[in-house]
């Protein structure tokens, strides 16, 4: 899942799970998998040649060198080093509060949050109107308004069509970008040496 509005894109390591299970769910391998998916989607679906991805920490103050948790040192940083060695431009881990609050997210093509509310709370605070939920790595293109079904306002004349309209536009853009990507990688020239 990638939540996006314009150039602000947030993806998640974990999905809809209880907060009590977040730390035990996050592994080096899971972070590497999500970074690879996010990176590929930014390239193929959003036509970003060399995406820069910021990765948020799990613990406050990025664990404060192990004082507030060891996940950064034992899991997140090793995953970032591995993926960086594979050519993915990933940086962090950044403390979520200061990173989002200072606007540092604007210097990156995407932000990988460790869990649902860590990524979605600031996204919805900063970009709710017109936000789009995009599902990466599917053979079909799937978008929806970032606000979800919004049953609480259904039939009350309160809903804005902006997120729905943006979801359609994103789907069209992704379709075109995928066509270009497919054409660019079709029939590559053979090496002549």
Which role does the model predict for each range below?
Residues 1-71, 77-193:
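Anion-binding alpha/beta catalytic cores of soluble intermediary-metabolism enzymes, centered on
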């Amino acid at each position: 899942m990638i939540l996006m509005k314009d150039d602000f894109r947030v993806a998640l390591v974990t999905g809809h799970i209880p907060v009590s299970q977040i730390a035990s769910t996050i592994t080096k391998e899971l972070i590497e998998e999500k970074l690879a998916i996010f990176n590929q989607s930014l390239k193929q679906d959003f036509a970003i040649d060399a995406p820069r991805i910021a990765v948020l920490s799990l613990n406050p103050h990025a664990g404060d060198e192990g004082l507030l948790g060891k996940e950064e040192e034992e899991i997140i940083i090793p995953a970032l080093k591995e993926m960086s060695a594979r050519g993915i431009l990933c940086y962090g881990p950044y403390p979520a509060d200061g990173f989002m609050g200072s606007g540092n997210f604007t210097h990156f093509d995407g932000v990988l949050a460790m869990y649902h509310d860590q990524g979605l709370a600031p996204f919805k605070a900063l970009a709710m109107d017109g936000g789009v939920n995009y599902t990466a790595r599917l053979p079909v293109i799937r978008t929806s308004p970032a606000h979800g079904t919004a049953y609480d306002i259904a039939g009350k004349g309160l809903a804005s069509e902006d997120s729905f309209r943006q979801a359609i536009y994103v789907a069209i853009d992704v379709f075109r970008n995928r066509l270009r990507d497919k054409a660019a990688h079709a029939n590559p020239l053979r090496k002549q040496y």
